[in-house]
Amino acid sequence: MLYPRNLALFSLLSLSSAAPSQVERSPDAVLKPRAVCTPTAGGSPSIDDVPAIRKAIASCGNGGTIVFPAGSTYYLNSVLDLAGCSNCDIQVEGVLKFSGSTEYWGGKTAMLNIDMINGLRLRSLTGSGVIDGNGQNAYDRFASDKNYKRPTLLYITGGSNIEVSGLRQKNPPNVFNSVKGDTQHVTFKNLRMDATSNSQNPPKNTDGFDIGASTHVTISSVSVTNDDDCVAFKPGSNYVTVEDVTCTGSHGISVGSLGKSGTDVVQNILAHRINMIESTKAAGIKTYPSGNGHGLSTVKNVTFSDFNVRGCDYAFQIESCYGESESYCESNPGNAILQGIVVKGFSGTTSGKYDPVVANLNCGARGTCDVSMSAFSVKAPSGKATVLCDNTPSSLGVSCTSGASG
């Protein structure tokens, strides 16, 4: 029904456009709906749902959407390779649960593999989606067999424009997320990650993020509970931002380890607005010393800022003798090049394990130690705040006491 005002407007438009031109819409200008596939779940741990998921990727992986509905559980008894996804959207609202078979997974690199894919969103829109690495058997086996090789839960190699968001990741056998192979533009956001053991054997080596050769990686609004580095910047990481992250029980935000056998570079890193709880350190740099086939480590333009330290053993640590004994490093001092390392805005209280020491900066005698610290107010439980230093610059920014190690 046309109301008077609308009728008048309609009449005016009719008079002013007595000979309207036809506007033809190009078929290419019409957005085609995305194909949507929902894999059929087998409904039993004895049925591997990976083939059904691969079939869905074959049908909908090129620009389409693959949905794992809320309330569903998919049992993954083999590696899930997302090859064939290009500009695709994988929406996990149910549970993807990997098998706990230590026989099958032994020696595998990845459980969920993203290799040379350009354009992929792996996400939960509701926050209910879970990727379960089912790692308890691996924790128990590794406790008695240190040679047992465990897979990474989510492994990204090469490719670009990848987003992982809104999910819970739990109990990986080894590392949660790995990025390498010159991958570009990866975003991790709004993730809940926890590795917990129900036996006396801890979930060893469960790094939250291992960021290797890659550029423009962002990690934001993430919580991690684990038993190794919360975030580790490995050789080749460049332009990485970590922000608004909470880490519990970890080894902190770490550069390294670097220089074990080759020339390693980490550069252009920003880690800020971090809550670090009951970790061995809040932030730090780990480099191998010189000699014995070790290489050269270069760490440039790295900023650690606005860290809230709660019960961590150290607030900040530089290790230039990583992987070797103190006596070895007396003969083969560290030679790492540290340039433009900024530590600022650290507050809170350490665990007291090294009370009154709150930071330990052991720069290599044969290296470069361009490090500055400011607004550093972390204290030990005693109320004291000793910073141990060796080979640090006079312009460091905090009062130093000799005797650093590591």
From Swiss-Prot:
Source species, domain of life: Eukaryota
Gene Ontology biological process terms in this record: cell wall organization; pectin catabolic process
Record's keyword terms, sorted: Carbohydrate metabolism, Cell wall biogenesis/degradation, Glycoprotein, Glycosidase, Hydrolase, Polysaccharide degradation, Repeat, Secreted, Signal
An example molecular function term from Gene Ontology annotations: polygalacturonase activity
Enzyme Commission code(s) on record: 3.2.1.-
Major subcellular location class: secreted
PbH1 repeat residues: 183-213, 214-235, 237-257, 299-320
Keyword NADP: no
Physiological role: Pectinolytic enzyme involved in the degradation of xylogalacturonan (xga), a galacturonan backbone heavily substituted with xylose, and which is one important component of the hairy regions of pectin. Activity requires a galacturonic acid backbone substituted with xylose.
Signal peptide: 1-18
Catalytic EC class: hydrolase
Glycan-modified residues: N301
Keyword rRNA-binding recorded: no
Residue ranges crossing the lipid bilayer per the database entry: none
Catalytic center residues: D228 (proton donor), H251
Locations listed in the record: Secreted
Name this protein carries in UniProt: Probable endo-xylogalacturonan hydrolase A
Family under the similarity heading: Belongs to the glycosyl hydrolase 28 family.
Gene3D superfamilies, per the entry: Single-stranded right-handed beta-helix, Pectin lyase-like
GO terms for cellular component: extracellular region
InterPro entries: Glyco_hydro_28, PbH1, Pectin_lyas_fold, Pectin_lyase_fold/virulence
